[in-house]
Amino acid sequence: GRLTSHKVFGEAIAILAGDALLTLAFRLVADNASSVKDPRAVGDAVAEIADAAGTAGMVGGQVVDIESEGKTVSAGTLEYIHLHKTAALIRASLRVGARLAGGDAPAVAAISEAGRDLGLAFQIVDDILDVEGSLEQLGKTAGKDQRQRKATYPALHGLEASRREARRLVERVKTRLAGFGERGAPLGALADYVFERKN
């Protein structure tokens, strides 16, 4: 694996890079607005990305994650953290793409649920990698979650149960995509990668 941005450039620059990427998302929507048939869909897309990134999504999940350090949390709190911290943005990205491409309500719903499951699987695997990974694989020091006493799936459920849950979620992503035929294959392959990744 490669060193993470905060290892290469420092924490301040890594945070600014995240800020820049977040604003770039809005720029990309604005730049492509003219290609969308329904102008209201563009406003909806901007609102959805903002919600997923802000206090109703990623920021809100991160706040609960930080506030939970060193505490025993329930399975519900852990799921809240992961669904908001990680899954909200993945779900929103897929939802916005499906809506702007003109997907009907059932297609958008299927993509939304696939995004939710994919985001949750991604975070569970991330938790597992923090336990089992190496600096060479991850690009960052493993074991940080345990040292900070963070709420993680392995800490609450154990490694094997965490692996089973991640695999179950990935399989559910692929089931949700079955109705899309070949158009869903790239996202199914991404789901497999999320489960098999080493960094």
Where are these regions (language model features)?
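Mg2+-dependent prenyl diphosphate-binding active-site environment of isoprenoid biosynthetic enzymes
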Residues: 1-175, 182-195
